[in-house]
């Protein structure tokens, strides 16, 4: 049986992550409160952010910026702003 969590991003019970994907206390918080579905949504946003802003994951400041964006997205309900991006459903 799949592990379920009360996902704070989706605001519902959903399948939880299989294991902790992020280190430290934030990783534990994500594991306990974020579903696979919500994590997948974050991964898409994360990829877009890394590409559009040309982030270097070897750079401490870039990693800190990405972590702040992740926390805002997953726990505060703030969408990631990517300059020039228009979601498909809004396009003509």
Swiss-Prot record:
GO terms for molecular function: iron ion binding. Signal peptide: none annotated. Transmembrane segments: none annotated. GO terms for biological process: cellular response to oxidative stress. Keywords: Iron. Pfam families: Iron_traffic. Belongs to the Fe(2+)-trafficking protein family. NCBIfam families: PRK05408.1. Could be a mediator in iron transactions between iron acquisition and iron-requiring processes, such as synthesis and/or repair of Fe-S clusters in biosynthetic enzymes. This is Probable Fe(2+)-trafficking protein. The lineage of its organism: Bacteria, Pseudomonadati, Pseudomonadota, Gammaproteobacteria, Alteromonadales.
């Amino acid at each position: 049986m799949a592990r379920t969590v009360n996902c704070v991003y989706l605001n519902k019970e959903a399948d939880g992550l299989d294991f902790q994907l992020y280190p430290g206390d934030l990783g534990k918080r994500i594991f306990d409160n974020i579903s696979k579905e919500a994590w997948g949504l974050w991964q898409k946003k994360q990829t877009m952010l890394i590409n559009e802003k040309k982030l270097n994951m070897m750079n401490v400041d870039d990693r800190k910026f990405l972590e702040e964006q992740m926390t805002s997205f997953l726990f505060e309900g703030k969408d990631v702003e990517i300059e020039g991006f228009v979601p498909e459903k809004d396009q003509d």
